[in-house]
């Protein structure tokens, strides 16, 4: 039974903007790289527009929805009798533990991300890079442009730095605001992210990211003597580091960690 026509009022508190364009949904799901043994994680399936296309893969699918109204609707739409591979989980994705999934080393993640939680969700994926193989995420166009920005632009910041440690964007396409209900005031973009495997990931990325977060929290304020000394020992000027974090500087820091 198709329950997508059932009206459920979107919750502003959850940042709900339901994707209603089936062509966009199909195009996004086709970007997901799924092997025969991979497990699919869908973030915030809403009314199941993406889920219906994911079902064609016949892989195990975990659709994680925080809104119980929607998770109940999805259970009716994808009953276990006909969709034994689709598991509807009423839970906050931010709190979801990937390790509870059997064979969770090869996860393909997809989702239309709430704008206000985009950074938190992306950092959760970065922190769990060892589980995630690839991800297709729909985000606010402004956030996408930041992720796609180069080091010599004002958009460059902590998100593209983090992405450079854990993976890279391989494909992207624009999504107009009218493809959603309710229609947001901004446009969106779909990004396909390929995550590095353990051997390809930058060493000490967790330690470096902790330091980068501290630096961006400080902005251009004077840092503590300890952090200034830390950067100096890496041969890095703080202002240059903040404005233009280049790959060779990252490896200067790696040498510091390897001492």
What spans do the regions from the language model cover?
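C-terminal lobe and adjacent flexible extensions of AdoMet/dcAdoMet transferase-like proteins
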Residues: 214-259
